[in-house]
């Protein structure tokens, strides 16, 4: 994990580290083996050289928000996961239950598990449970990779979100229970 020197002891940074440390050791080892870096930043994600090309661009699913990647507090899916410090919680510039878990899940999905969200077996689960879990939220009902990332975040965030996942999407819950 890469943390700005002026934020090493920031309580928000400590909470991010704590939440990510709840992931199974085998999963953390796979992130490390694939050289996936989690960068905590104190400015826009587009300030990082690897994401500068996104400046002024509108993210998929954000077309009606008047927001660009400059406003989005996190990104995952590549060898770099970028998380803006202080934006972890729902409603802080995003609609996820937890930013760092959601964005890390994208890199796990695309790199570690070789796009597991696009497999027929996962898509079958997604199609059968996405409406029950997320209602008509098109971000999760249209994109299996977003469903994967958000359900992953629910599984690992806390007992309340994990219980909600188990109740509303038992197949998804079992999928993550078995994912190492």
Show the residue positions of the predicted features:
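Active-site-flanking segments in enzyme catalytic domains
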Residues: 1-19, 29-180
């Amino acid at each position: 994990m890469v943390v700005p020197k002026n934020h090493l002891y920031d309580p928000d940074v400590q909470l991010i580290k704590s939440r990510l440390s709840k992931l199974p050791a085998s999963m953390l080892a796979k992130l490390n083996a694939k050289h996936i870096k989690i960068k905590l930043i104190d400015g826009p994600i587009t300030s990082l050289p690897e994401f500068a090309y996104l400046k002024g661009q509108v993210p998929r699913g954000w077309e009606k928000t008047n927001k660009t990647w400059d406003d989005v507090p996190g990104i995952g899916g590549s060898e770099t996961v970028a998380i803006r410090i202080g934006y972890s919680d729902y409603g802080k510039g995003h609609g996820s239950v937890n930013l760092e878990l959601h964005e890390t899940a994208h890199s796990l999905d695309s790199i570690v598990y070789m796009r597991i969200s696009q497999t027929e077996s996962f898509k079958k689960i997604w199609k059968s449970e996405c409406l029950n879990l997320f209602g008509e939220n098109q971000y999760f009902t249209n994109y299996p990779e977003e469903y994967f990332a958000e359900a992953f975040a629910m599984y690992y965030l806390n007992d309340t979100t994990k219980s909600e996942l188990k109740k509303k999407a038992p197949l998804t819950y079992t999928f993550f229970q078995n994912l190492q």
